Amino acid sequence: MFGTAPSLAAFFAWTLSLLILMEILRTRLVMTGQVPANGFSPGNDGLSPFLQRLARAHLNCVESLPVFGGLMLLAIATHRTAVTDPLAAVLVAARIAQSTIHLVSTSAPAVTLRFAAFAVQLAIAAWWAWSLLRALV
């Protein structure tokens, strides 16, 4: 099982992978003349629903990285990875599941699964925050 540092690296890599995919697809649109180079908005408004979901999935990762990544970095910096190691890979797997579900479907069952994956991340982060506070105070 991955510990905290490899899981944090995986979180960064997943976020970067979503960004790279988005830029590959945007580049293709520009190169084929479908969209001018200055024709993109941050949310990919006016583009395909998939590209809009991809932008949102990437932004979800970026928005959550300070909280989840911050807790992992705190554990690493304070030598308290015993708190985060057991669930670090689970958190990243839940993040990848949430993003993947977001990309493939917007059906009600998919949204419910996506929320469940996010709830797993929130529960883990809350546990980590509580445990780290107890260990550091």
Located regions from the model:
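Juxtamembrane boundary at the C-terminal end of a transmembrane helix
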Residues: A126-V137
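N-terminal signal-anchor transmembrane alpha helix
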Residues: F2-F40
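Interfacial loop-to-transmembrane junctions
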Residues: A97-A123
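Helix-boundary and loop/linker segments of multi-pass membrane transporters
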Residues: M1, S41-G46, A77
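Short alpha-helical packing/oligomerization segments
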Residues: G70-A93
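Hydrophobic residues within alpha-helical transmembrane segments
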Residues: A10-A13, H58, A89-A93, A116
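A loop-to-helix transmembrane entry motif
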Residues: F50-L65, P86
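Core segments of transmembrane alpha-helices
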Residues: L59-L73, A125
